[in-house]
Design a protein with these regions (language model features):
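Conserved catalytic cores of soluble enzyme domains
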Residues: 1-78
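Short acidic (Asp/Glu) and glycine-rich catalytic loops that position anionic groups and cofactors
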Residues: 23-24, 43-50, 91-102, 154-158
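Charge-rich, low-complexity amphipathic helices
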Residues: 26-27, 33-34, 68-69, 84, ...
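Short, exposed beta-strand "edge-strand" segments with a Pro/Gly-rich flavor and a Y/T-containing core
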Residues: 32-35, 50-57, 104-115, 160-167
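Terminal amphipathic helices with adjacent charged low-complexity linkers/tails
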Residues: 57-121
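Non-catalytic terminal/interface segments that mediate subunit docking, oligomerization
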Residues: 111-169
């Protein structure tokens, strides 16, 4: 396991990187098991366990992802998250949401009809832009940051389009 990196608020891990308390050589010598660094502490392992929030291509992409993330976060706990003026009208029509919900609620399965919440989040956010946190983990739950009217909002949505939205973690 990896404990110290997860003590931060968000963790961005480039592909082809490893972090952990011990490496493959220690596992081999102590347990006699032959595992690779990637299997032990690579980005795929950590994204599935919830340790890594974002997997990116390389260190440059990690810096870009960090900058993208910082656009949604306040400088400290005593101030609000940054407001960005938007040209996206707050009162615009969201016909796709209306169609999606009408089809779901008018279907024979009613409230049990799967709804893809990515569509709803995209329709609600300014210009359809949002940042999903831990996109590789728990596809049945969407956790994201976005903006409405230039103000930062957070989403935690049960995505019934995946595994009927059942919480399985």
């Amino acid at each position: 396991g990896s404990y110290l990196p997860r003590q931060g608020s968000f963790l961005i891990q480039p592909k082809d990187t490893f972090f952990g308390l011990t490496g493959p050589n220690v596992v081999r010598s102590v347990l006699g098991e032959d595992v690779s660094a990637d299997e032990l502490g690579g980005p795929e392992v950590h994204s599935q366990s919830g340790v890594t929030d974002f997997i990116v291509e390389d260190e440059i992409a990690a810096l870009r992802k960090g900058r993208e993330l910082l656009r949604y976060l306040p400088d400290n706990n005593s101030v609000m998250a940054p407001h960005y003026p938007t040209s996206d009208p707050i009162d615009r029509d969201t016909k796709d949401i209306d169609i999606l919900l009408r089809n779901a609620f008018n279907s024979p399965t009613g409230f049990n009809t799967p709804i893809d919440f990515y569509i709803i989040i995209q329709q609600l956010c300014d210009h359809g832009d949002f940042l999903e946190i831990q996109p590789s983990r728990a596809r049945n739950t969407v956790t994201a940051l976005g903006r409405m009217g230039g103000n930062v909002i957070g989403f935690v949505a049960n995505n019934s389009a995946v595994s009927s939205g059942q919480i399985d973690i």
